[in-house]
UniProtKB/Swiss-Prot annotation:
Record: residues binding Mg(2+) 1: 303, 316
Cofactor detail note: Binds 2 magnesium or manganese ions per subunit.
Positions that bind Mg(2+) 2: 316, 318
Protein's recorded name: D-alanine--D-alanine ligase
Taxonomic source organism: Leuconostoc mesenteroides subsp. mesenteroides (strain ATCC 8293 / DSM 20343 / BCRC 11652 / CCM 1803 / JCM 6124 / NCDO 523 / NBRC 100496 / NCIMB 8023 / NCTC 12954 / NRRL B-1118 / 37Y)
Amino acid sequence: MTKKRVALIFGGNSSEHDVSKRSAQNFYNAIEATGKYEIIVFAIAQNGFFLDTESSKKILALEDEQPIVDAFMKTVDASDPLARIHALKSAGDFDIFFPVVHGNLGEDGTLQGLFKLLDKPYVGAPLRGHAVSFDKALTKELLTVNGIRNTKYIVVDPESANNWSWDKIVAELGNIVFVKAANQGSSVGISRVTNAEEYTEALSDSFQYDYKVLIEEAVNGARELEVGVIGNDQPLVSEIGAHTVPNQGSGDGWYDYNNKFVDNSAVHFEIPAQLSPEVTKEVKQMALDAYKVLNLRGEARMDFLLDENNVPYLGEPNTLPGFTNMSLFKRLWDYSDINNAKLVDMLIDYGFEDFAQNKKLSYSFVSLGEEKIGKFN
């Protein structure tokens, strides 16, 4: 039986480039463990160029990346308008894309648009699901209008930010807030703010990453929860995981980039989270509701905050969850009796299923007949 060819894409130009490599290693091993697929790897360098498969294999093996990229760039025809994606031709045809590009390109819908243009199946949400979910402000608007509980927030740009003094923020949202770049992931461009000086610095930092910034209320006594969701029309939800960070060190009591990807030794993980049956049911239902409202497919991780009264608030979705050894998403499915190999096999099947379903849709056009207009008369 001929094995289907899976194009595993990793790297990218975001701050999560190195995280993507570690996720891709685990996905590669899981796909290989199924024994069902041939894997072709493509790294996207930090300059945005797809690298050929041989160079990509070296980068996946964590060889020193820059010399590999430099050598590849010497082979690039700079006059080719498609030079950035030209390397995709180097491996011949393949059956499905498996993107593992965190942050920009992978989670904002860019790659999914390319896959759709190439008329190829791919793992994960469609372009619009990624694009909407990557924009924290737009996500919160959709959650709110659909009755899915989330925290109070304000959205500002560089001009309107001048209208929101620290005193005004405190009156509206309380004296502890989080300032976040609207279009970034994994705690990049996020600051916990407790005074006017920190507020000014946080805005300046977040505006380095996006021209739209979210200012969000803090949740009193918050426990951070995570839930995995996989599937298409009838998605499955994992057990709920919880993590707590001591109020010390770089994290200041919240789950920041360092705690997620650099050193999680101080983080306490709890799988499954010790919650009442009522709260467990509510969190899982909110996760499923958000998955559908945001038009997600394939996979996602839903992050929640649980306040001191055990009321859950949906924080934000992650449409391409990390799959490193430190990632809770990976561990949640392990606990739910879906091991890595089974999980990736299901994700690939969901990708083929969604592609086949979309092929049934009609994209007909209306002819304008022989009428000629403008300069073409």
